[in-house]
Amino acid sequence: MAFKDTFNKMISYFDTDEVNEVEEDVAASTDNVIPRSQQSVRASSHPKQEPRNNHVQQDHQARSQEQTRSQMHPKHGTSERYYQQSQPKEGHEMVDRRKRMSTSGIANRREQYQQSTCSDQTTIALKYPRKYEDAQEIVDLLIVNECVLIDFQFMLDAQARRCLDFIDGASKVLYGSLQKVGSSMYLLAPSNVSVNIEEMTIPHTTQDIGFDFDMKRR
């Protein structure tokens, strides 16, 4: 019996050691499980914090964008005001320039018209030659493009004939025209003047029939 009791005691001793080891293993496993759970909780808490941080960053970006927009709007308004203020000035300047150009253009046209009229203006001179030397003065007027109305009533037939020959030759050289307009009157015209005279019957009373120029005899 004593041997059996000692044997049982030995068995129970070893059994208690195994139980203690098992308990220690269980405690260690529980200790390992607890930190893992805490780590999982911490890890799960971090994803919750990240969206919050993203949301805060988005709010900050939105505020910064609003501030930049608010800063841009006054500048845009000032630029529009400046454009609106400068536009009437530019419009007035354009109107003034157009008025000046129109007035200057009108003045230039007037000057050109006056010059052209002065250059194109034709003068008719009335001459009563009394001697042969007066024919040269009549030809000089033709050179400056003046019309000359010649009346030979104060000249003799021979002198008048010589004057007419000289004037007729000069008119042909200067491309003028010499036409009879009366019993003792002739019209000398330059090349830039056209003369249209209606035919008329000139009485030949008291005139020399043999004289080709129909000059009065005095």
Curated annotation (Swiss-Prot):
Q: Which UniProt keywords apply?
A: Cell cycle, Cell division, Cytoplasm, Septation
Which residue stretches belong to region Disordered? 25-115
Q: Where in the cell is it found?
A: Cytoplasm
Asked if the record carries the keyword ATP-binding, the reply is no
The record describes its quaternary structure and partners as: Homodimer. Interacts with FtsZ.
Q: Which HAMAP family match?
A: SepF
Composition bias (Polar residues) maps to 29-43
Compositional bias (Basic and acidic residues): 47-63
Any one GO BP annotation for this protein: FtsZ-dependent cytokinesis
Question: What is stated as this protein's family in its record?
Answer: Belongs to the SepF family.
Name of the featured protein? Cell division protein SepF
The record's annotation in InterPro entries points to: Cell_div_SepF (IPR023052), Cell_div_SepF/SepF-rel (IPR007561), SepF-like_sf (IPR038594)
Tell me which GO cellular component terms the UniProt record holds.
cytoplasm
Function of the protein: Cell division protein that is part of the divisome complex and is recruited early to the Z-ring. Probably stimulates Z-ring formation, perhaps through the cross-linking of FtsZ protofilaments. Its function overlaps with FtsA.
